[in-house]
């Protein structure tokens, strides 16, 4: 009976992860489109950060499934080491994304362009809602898995980044401060790198 309960709990956890992956992937595409249409680099930066969140959730799901396999003749310690490998892959992804964002932001300093503030605010607002929902989906599972905890923390940090993008979009609307978009991009990139190196 306990085994059946554990199996049902794991199945519910997998479904939550799949749902979180789905909404993060759709959100990433929406942010990229919104960033291109509005000219906002910080929105694209947030999209790339969101993409790393989706990747971490995919890795967490795969690690959960592999981790449930018992030891065999080839894997004497079982498959649970897959979580450690998954966490390492996620770390490398964060660092690559962070460096790319810095490169793009520096280029924007030398070639600034106008940005459509309303598009930035609306898309980032939707992103914030999705980030909060995704974080709630993974919160309970994060207590029992370092890999899912990492994915949960990524969603929380992405929600904070979305708040920053909303603020930048508002400043662009009110004062035409286009430079706030570039500065925020550097801040997001810096945080992504710090998050990667401190994991």
Q: What residue spans do the PLM features occupy?
A:
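Alpha-helical transmembrane segments and adjacent TM-loop junctions that form the membrane-embedded core
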Residues: 2-19, 42, 48, 56-199
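The first (N-terminal) embedded transmembrane alpha-helix
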Residues: 20-30
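Short, hydrophobic transmembrane alpha-helix segments
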Residues: 33-44
């Amino acid at each position: 009976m306990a085994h059946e309960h554990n199996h049902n709990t794991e199945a519910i956890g997998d479904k939550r992860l799949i749902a979180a992956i789905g909404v993060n992937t759709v959100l990433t595409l929406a942010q990229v489109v919104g960033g291109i249409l509005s000219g906002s680099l910080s929105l694209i930066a947030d999209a790339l950060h969101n993409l790393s969140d989706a990747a971490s959730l995919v890795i967490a799901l795969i690690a959960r499934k592999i981790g449930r396999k018992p030891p065999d003749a080839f894997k004497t310690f079982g498959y649970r080491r897959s979580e450690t490998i998954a966490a390492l892959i996620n770390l490398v992804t964060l660092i690559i994304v962070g460096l790319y964002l810095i490169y793009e932001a520096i280029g924007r300093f030398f070639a600034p362009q106008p940005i459509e503030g309303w598009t930035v605010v609306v898309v980032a607002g939707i992103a914030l809602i999705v980030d909060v929902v995704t974080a709630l989906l993974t919160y309970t599972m994060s207590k029992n898995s370092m890999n899912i905890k990492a994915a949960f923390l990524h969603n929380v940090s992405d929600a904070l980044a979305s708040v920053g993008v909303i603020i930048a979009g508002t400043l662009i609307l009110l004062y035409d401060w286009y430079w706030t978009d570039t500065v925020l991009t550097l801040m997001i990139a810096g945080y992504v790198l710090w998050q990667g190196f401190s994991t």
